[in-house]
From Swiss-Prot:
Name by which UniProt lists this protein: Chromosomal replication initiator protein DnaA
Domain IV, binds dsDNA: annotated span: 333-452
Region described as Domain II: 80-114
One Pfam family it belongs to: Bac_DnaA
GN (gene name): dnaA
Protein family per UniProt: Belongs to the DnaA family.
Sequence segments annotated as region (Domain I, interacts with DnaA modulators): 1-80
Keywords carried by this UniProt record: ATP-binding, Cytoplasm, DNA replication, DNA-binding, Lipid-binding, Nucleotide-binding
Domain notes: Domain I is involved in oligomerization and binding regulators, domain II is flexibile and of varying length in different bacteria, domain III forms the AAA+ region, while domain IV binds dsDNA.
Biological source species: Histophilus somni (strain 129Pt)
Length: 452
């Protein structure tokens, strides 16, 4: 296929439509305008963000395609932001000034408005089974923001599990790929305050224009919108505007979207349009890895057996682990003592005592019995029907995961069962969690309930 100067961009688009996803084509390529001469083609992007993205991801592909269509290896393709001029009166100096102004405006707005924590990146996010999927999806979004399959991205889980870290990591990842992008991180409470302030100062037009034109909007703790009708109404329209334009939306909450009370159904429905991913409390291996990673960042000597001890005792969330580590570090520096298990046991005695009270076997039995609508006595009975056996195995596995009780102690609390029965239950549940999505979902729900 060959082209003429007058049909070049149209012919390029026809081929590009088959080479890129429909979402990418609509978002990045269709908005471009062309100005073609015998020696080059200038593409005009409606804003700096699209210009930067096309320049980084498609310009080489477009240039090669244009050269092939014209059979001219010297043909050049350039891109700049702005509207295609009706007459070519803009000088090079004027165009350079326009580009610099646009870049400076976006950079200034980004530095002032993004609120991203540059220290929260993917490289220092400790991965484990509890957050593996969430991290993978977040990285995909950072590389390809706006892809419909993950828009919005909804991360949910208990306090201190790393949702906010991942949120910032995605934002920083988007900016790393495209420094011109307008990425805004906002806690839900701050968003509400911004909305009320705009309302009172009669600046709603400015408020709407800003939030509806960003390239990625990251809202933390969306459950804070509960019962705030005005905020929900405005966010509904912001969501629609961004989604229709293929802009990325990322939200976090302490619970699954449909479980958030006093949030309008139309918003809950939209929260589920993309992908919702749970972040669970970290398992022992991840807890230990987090402690060792944080200790390394502090240049702190933390023996692995001590990390195992702390990780085995404190199971609720990452924030709790960091708090414990900070206390141990401070006490060690103040006293000059070596960090041993005995030293940690003494330093964290109040935290460890509280943790023992937080999750008990009795509490686990009650939560599991309520969840499956059976009696606690069923969990302790000799009954072997499937509707009793599976909850019993789950309860025993949870007791091993969330308490400091030994296998024999757990067995005694479940109708004087042998420790080998408890071990078998733990192995069976671990296997089922990998093979059966229903069991994994039950496990996640129970863990979240017990971690509150």
């Amino acid at each position: 296929m060959s082209s003429t100067v007058s049909t070049l961009w149209r012919d390029c688009l026809l081929q590009l439509q088959d080479q890129v996803s429909s979402n990418d084509f609509t978002t990045w390529l269709r908005p471009l305008q062309d100005d073609v001469s015998e020696s080059n083609m200038i593409l005009y992007a409606p804003n700096c963000f699209i210009k930067g993205w096309v320049e980084n991801h498609y310009l080489t592909q477009i240039t090669k395609l244009a050269q092939q269509l014209l059979n001219n290896d010297q043909f050049m393709v350039k891109i700049q932001d702005g509207i295609k001029p009706t007459e070519k009166t803009t000088t090079n100096v004027e165009q350079k000034t326009q580009n610099e102004n646009c870049h400076n405006e976006i950079t200034s707005q980004q530095n002032y408005r993004s609120y991203l924590n540059k220290n929260h990146v993917f490289d220092n996010f400790v991965e484990g089974k509890s957050n593996q999927l969430a991290r993978a999806v977040a990285q995909k979004v950072a590389k390809n923001p706006g892809e419909q399959s993950a828009n919005p991205l909804f991360l949910y889980g208990g306090t201190g599990l790393g949702k906010t870290h991942l949120l910032h990591a995605v934002g920083n990842g988007i900016l790393a790929n495209n420094p011109h992008a307008q990425v805004v991180y906002m806690h839900a409470e701050r968003f509400m305050q911004s909305y009320v302030k705009a309302l009172k100062s009669d600046r709603m037009d400015s408020f709407k224009r800003f939030y509806r034109t960003v390239d990625a909007l990251l809202i933390d703790d969306i459950q804070f919108f509960a019962g705030k009708d005005g905020t929900q109404e405005e966010f509904f329209h912001i969501f629609n505007s961004l989604f229709e334009r293929g802009r990325q939306i990322i939200l976090t909450s302490d619970r699954y979207p449909k479980e958030i009370e006093k949030i309008e159904d139309r918003l809950k429905s939209r929260f589920g349009w993309g992908i919702s991913v749970a972040i669970e409390p970290p398992e022992l291996e991840t807890r230990v890895a987090i402690l060792l990673k944080k200790a390394e960042e502090k240049n702190m000597v933390l023996p692995e057996e001590v990390a195992m001890f702390i990780g085995g005792k404190l199971r609720t969330n990452v924030r709790e682990l960091e708090g414990a580590l900070n206390r141990v570090h401070a006490h060690a520096e103040f006293t000059g003592k070596a960090i041993t298990i005995d030293f940690v046991r003494e330093t964290l005695k109040d935290m460890l005592a509280l943790q023992d009270k937080l999750v008990t076997i009795e509490n686990i039995q009650k939560i599991v019995a309520d969840y499956y609508r059976i009696k606690i006595s069923d969990l302790k009975s000799k009954r072997r029907s499937r509707n009793i056996t599976r909850p019993r195995q789950l309860a025993m596995a949870l007791a091993k995961e969330l308490t400091n009780r030994s296998l024999p102690e757990i067995g005694r609390n479940f109708g004087d069962r042998d420790h080998t029965t408890v071990l078998h239950a733990c192995k069976a549940i671990a296997k089922l969690r990998e093979e059966d999505n229903g069991i994994q979902e039950d496990w996640s729900n129970l863990i979240r309930t017990l971690s509150v």
